[in-house]
Amino acid sequence: MKLSKKTKTLLCVALVLILLGSALAGLFNTGIGATKVTRIFFDGGHGRLSGLLYMPKDASADNPKPAVIVTHGYLNSAEMQDANAIELSRRGFVVLALDQYDHGHSALDHSVYSDTSFFGIWLPFWANSMNDAVQYMYDQPYVLKDENGNGLIGVTGHSMGGFSSTLALAFDEMQAAESGVRKVACGLSEGSDFMYTSFVGVDAATADALGGGRTMGKVCAQYDEFFFNDPTVEGGTVRHKDYVSTPDGMTFLQQSAPAQANTWYDTADGGRRIIYEPAQTHPWNHFSATTTGYAISFYQTAFAEYASMLKDIAPANQVWQWKEAFECVALVGFIMLIVVLAGILIELPFFKLAKTGELAVAKAPQGGKRIATWLILLVAILLPAIFFTPLMDGGAGSPGVMVLFYAGIVAAVGGLAALCLAIAKKQGKGAVIGGICLTLSGALLALIAKLPMYQDYAVWTAPGVNSIAYWTIGCALMSLTILSAVYVCMKRGEGASFENYGVSFKPMAIIAGLCTALVTIVIAYAVLWLMDALFKADFRIWTFAFKTFDASIIPAILRYLPTFLLFYIVSTAGITVNTNTDRLQGGKGYLLAILLNAGGPIIWLAVQYITLFSTGVAAQPGSALSSIVLVAMVPTLSIAAVISRNLYKKTGNIWTPAFLNAILMTTMTIANTMVAFK
């Protein structure tokens, strides 16, 4: 097979973007050569822990340095702390960016789970991660101790990592009462208060009592979706905060009246404490020059006595943004590579069976039908936003979801009537299948509205994905119901067939499409693994990332795959029939495809956060985790839309893009989240 000049050019551009982006990201990850970054694994006592060790070039057993352990929050991994890791290590600190248990490359021993309930698998990972990492780092010869053997280690974590850090500080003081040695010298939590540590007995008063004269701080964002709440205010947590004026904030700072943010306070035990209050949201903390500057300033203050061992670089002097920028460049190359690889494969023997012929471009509807079509498209775009909160936060049987139950019943009855009419009047195979699709989609929509799903954590072992999966299957069935109803009521009368939706029932096209998707993803991930091995870089921007993973999560990927496959089959069919018209060629077709996939989430997020920043209370103040999760869904669904439109044009059907998107996005999602029972 001879590649066209365009294909060769696109392949070269993709590879150059990946290689150049990864190499430069790797350069800035090392602080422009100031540190060496390696991935390490060690026995943490409760399982296997992993992390990225940032070792200053002059640190060694003969020249030990103060150390800082940084870790991520729930559903993330070590790379989410790259800003702190890069900036602290280039200033001379030894830094361990830690994967908490059951995140990234770390895994909790199964015996540690108390049971298979959410609480039973959720509590052990963060309660133990930071404390276990402290024990490991204290034993390393390149980590500095004082003349009394006390460890010069700082602990910093975001969100659940912050809770883990708070517990590590408390546990260290308890352990020091017996050993006479404090291993942790100071700690800065980001995006966490004492809400969850109180579950294990460490509330604000206890943490204060166990301070032990340490230097401690908190980053408490003013618009944090979860924490730092005024206990006198009810009605949801997604609102403006002022933690220094709350009882817990004052207790932490040992003040009897509302304190000042960004101000150091001396404590009765000889320590110092500070609360920083950036005007940010929860996930904004770990993608912020301001918060990173706070971390730098905090540790420069905490370890001021050892300044001669460190580099005096101002907090505002930061380079981590370049690492993020070049990883984004590599991300663009990665997506390009996937599309180009799939296009090359379908020209090869066997794989070319994935193609079923070029789809004829349909005439765009005119007059009243055009208006009706755009109104239907608007509804299709809005529905995922309208039902996002009920599906994500309410769940089966909740009032909002029950609207879908009744809508599903109406659709199923309408589909059954259309089916009976098609049979009675002998309207043909298309009319019969259309009636069946409408009946089944409506019935299934009604069923999932009443049926609790993804509840067994022994099976659905990625808790953070379960609500996403429920919303996804709800969106898939809403879309399928609309597609079926429009076909029965409009499209069939216009002469449309399943070919217009990209639906081919040829077995070999389906099998070859699956094989094309699998081989494409294997090759693309091999490139990702190579970049990780060479440069310790992956492909990401903020919370959206394609990263390496362990084989232990493959069973979880396979369990969630059917849910996301259903969504991408329906999504690709909808994109195919709605963008393959004479008025939507080129960029306009891609734009509509993106809106069909990601328009709902974009609208929901815009309303949520514009309302939050303008009024101080979000449009949905009870949607904390779900609003954060939705941020990464925007690039996920947008990229999937581009892949769907590009590949249906090349194959003439939905199967290759649907399989590719489902496998790719499910793998990406599971690799970036907590997975229990690995």
Regions found by a protein language model. Give the residues of each.
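Short, Lys/Arg-rich N-terminal segment immediately upstream of the first membrane anchor
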Residues: 1-7, 317-321, 361-368
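An N-terminal hydrophobic leader/cap segment in hydrolases
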Residues: 3-43, 50-53
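Hydrophobic core segments of alpha-helical transmembrane domains in multi-pass membrane transport
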Residues: 17-21, 334-340, 419, 665-666
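Alpha-helical transmembrane segments of multi-pass membrane proteins
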Residues: 22-27, 303, 339-343, 382-390
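Soluble extramembrane regions of membrane proteins in the secretory/endomembrane system
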Residues: 34-319
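Juxtamembrane/start-of-transmembrane alpha-helix segments at the extracytoplasmic/lumenal side
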Residues: 317-331
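Juxtamembrane interface at the cytosolic side of transmembrane helices
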Residues: 333-379, 423-430
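Alpha-helical transmembrane segments of integral membrane proteins
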Residues: 375-678
